[in-house]
UniProtKB/Swiss-Prot annotation:
InterPro entries: Ribosomal_bS20, Ribosomal_bS20_sf. GO terms for molecular function: small ribosomal subunit rRNA binding; structural constituent of ribosome. GO terms for biological process: translation. Keywords: Ribonucleoprotein, Ribosomal protein, RNA-binding, rRNA-binding. This is Small ribosomal subunit protein bS20. GO terms for cellular component: cytosol; small ribosomal subunit.
Length: 93
């Protein structure tokens, strides 16, 4: 239990922020997971259409401070790379 009133306020604020951050990160991870499932299922046209949505979810989490901007850049790079690799292997066949 906090001893000071300000510490109690900070604890309440931190709890609200933790829940909001968890919401942003969860939405982002779900979008990435669904995107990866599309690529594994070889549904590349749908995956190509979903890429902007996935990127926006990642950037939204970074803009709200839920993840670091460098982590967002890395995740965007990886999902884009994943799609490009799948498209390239599909063209070779």
């Amino acid at each position: 239990m906090p001893n000071k009133r300000q510490a109690a306020k900070r604890a309440r604020r931190d709890e609200r922020r933790r829940e909001i951050n968890a919401l942003h990160v969860s939405r982002m991870k779900t979008a990435i997971r669904n995107f990866k499932k599309l690529i594994q299922a070889k549904d590349l046209e749908t995956a190509k259409a979903k890429l902007p949505f996935v990127v926006s979810m990642i950037q939204h989490a970074a803009a709200k401070g839920s993840i670091h901007k460098n982590e967002a850049a890395r995740r965007v790079s990886r999902v884009t790379q994943l799609l490009n690799k799948a498209l390239a292997s599909n063209e070779q066949k």
